[in-house]
Design a protein with these regions (language model features):
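A cross-family kinase active-site recognition segment
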Residues: 2, 121, 126, 149-215, ...
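AlphaC helix of the protein kinase catalytic domain
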Residues: 140-150
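Conserved short submotifs of the Hanks-type protein kinase catalytic core
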Residues: 126-138
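Catalytic activation segment of kinase domains across protein kinase-like and atypical kinase folds
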Residues: 250-283
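Conserved NTP-binding catalytic cores of kinases and kinase-like/nucleotidyltransferase enzymes
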Residues: 1-125, 220, 235, 255-260, ...
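Active-site catalytic-loop/activation-segment of kinase and kinase-like phosphoryl-transfer enzymes
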Residues: 2-21, 180-231, 369-382, 386
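Catalytic-loop of the protein kinase fold
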Residues: 242-244, 249
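Active-site activation/catalytic loop segments of kinase-like enzymes and analogous catalytic loops
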Residues: 275-314, 328-348
Length: 421
């Protein structure tokens, strides 16, 4: 049976309880492997209003069946309750179809080593998918980011960047296959607003308001450079590839191979690859585990990413094409994240994960301004970012840089001590 075949084991009006999810998942396993499998929940990995993720032991399994699986189910609540016939952009159903189609699409490519978890099957009506269980002992990049083992972190950073490059390289030119799979499982392929156009509508007004609030004038070239960013992001040309949509450092599993296996595809689809690669530079604009990476680590990650991407995308070797496009992607995320809460100018600073919102905003402004000078593109926005960072740093009385990740602090501190002697 195809991994994208529809199942109808749960009535549409039923709320998916754990028992309902287990019965639906058992039907999927039986269709795939035969027998009469029974599932027992051994661990709840995530339980939020949007979705639940369960680890389950497989009992009475056939020889071919795995002994443990992962169930990911979508629920939603209120107006966002899951409806299999509602594929409106950004809704619960839309995220579910992205998740299922993303996993099925990557499985269909039959890559060795694999780049995703491995899909067993899904149930459209119940709103769940069953995935291979990669086990509970492995690590992600986030684990090493919190540790003090520098060699291990460098290996993890290299694997993360190479894996992104490989994922993008292997999926360029295959957007119709992804769309076909999404239709097969019940998605209606509603037109999604392009990210650059969405930035113009949602983020740029907030960024303008932030600048006005702190009395930082916009340069005359502001609108022209913003339009250029929109055009690059929405017209990716050779860089049009599959992206998971949320490549935070804990949304994958590092493996014994040089490559990671990605998961969490709720926002997956085809877009400008460098919007995802921008996570290397900023770093990680939508994630909780943000500190600062030393420049040599960023350069290493960039080289690994470009090396893998260029295997299927020769344009990635062209500095004159790659760097302006990558910088536009960084500008997109800088403007987008600064517009959230208008940069948290007033009131108390908020901590998210291992750093504060203000620390993140200053880091992104600083790194973007530095990059505009180095690459020689978007000079007006680069100058504005430099001025805005200085303005906010004074207002917030934040003189110190964002801390380095723990594994890099030891070397930095030792260097400072040696210099003081």
């Amino acid at each position: 049976m195809s991994e994208t075949s529809k199942q109808t084991s749960v009535e549409p009006e039923q709320i998916v309880t754990d028992d309902n999810a287990l019965r639906a998942a058992e039907t999927i396993l039986a269709a795939r492997y035969g027998g009469t499998p029974r599932l027992t929940v051994t661990e709840t990995l995530r339980e939020k209003s949007r979705n639940r993720v369960l680890r389950c032991a497989v009992e009475e399994a056939t020889t071919d069946s795995p002994v443990s699986v992962i169930i990911k189910s979508v629920d939603g609540e209120g107006e966002n309750a899951y409806d299999p016939d509602n594929d409106a952009p950004n809704g619960t159903g839309w995220r579910f179809y992205n998740e299922w189609a993303g996993n099925a699409f990557l499985d269909r490519l039959n890559l060795d080593p694999p780049v995703s978890t491995g899909l067993i099957g899904g149930d459209r009506v119940a709103g769940l998918i069953v995935l291979q269980d990669l086990g509970s002992e492995g690590k992600s990049l986030a684990d090493w980011m919190l540790a003090e083992d520098r060699p291990a972190l460098l290996v993890a950073l290299r694997s993360y960047a190479a894996s992104l490059g490989r994922l993008h390289a292997e999926t360029i030119g295959k957007e119709e296959l992804f769309s076909q799979i999404r239709r097969e499982i019940g998605g209606t392929e509603t037109i999604q607003e392009l990210p650059g156009a969405k930035m113009l509508r949602e983020s740029v007004p907030g960024f303008r308001d932030l600048c006005a609030q702190v009395e930082e004038p916009l340069p005359p070239q502001f609108d022209a450079e913003i339009e250029r960013i929109r055009a690059i992001v929405d017209e990716p040309g050779p860089f049009f590839a599959f992206t998971p949509g949320d490549t935070c450092p804990d949304n994958h599993r590092l493996t014994e191979t040089p490559y990671a296996r990605f998961f969490d595809f709720e926002f997956a689809g085809f877009a400008h690859a460098l919007l995802t690669a921008a996570y290397i530079y900023l770093p990680f604009p939508t994630c909780w585990c943000v500190n600062r990476l030393p420049e040599e680590a960023v350069t290493m990650m960039e080289n690994e990413y470009r090396k893998e991407l260029s295997l299927q995308c020769p344009s990635a070797k062209d500095d004159a094409l790659f760097y302006p496009q990558a910088l536009a992607a960084r500008a997109f995320w800088t403007i987008t994240t600064l517009s959230w809460g208008k940069g948290a100018v007033e009131g108390e600073d908020d901590t998210w994960g291992i750093s504060t919102i203000r620390q993140r905003n200053l880091l992104r402004l600083d790194t973007f301004a530095d990059a505009t000078e180095k690459i020689g593109e978007f000079p007006a926005l680069g100058d504005l970012s430099r001025r805005l960072a200085a303005n906010l740093r004074t207002r917030w009385n934040l003189a110190e840089e964002m801390p380095l990740y723990p594994a890099f602090r030891i070397t930095a501190n030792e260097t400072k001590s040696e210099g003081a002697k």
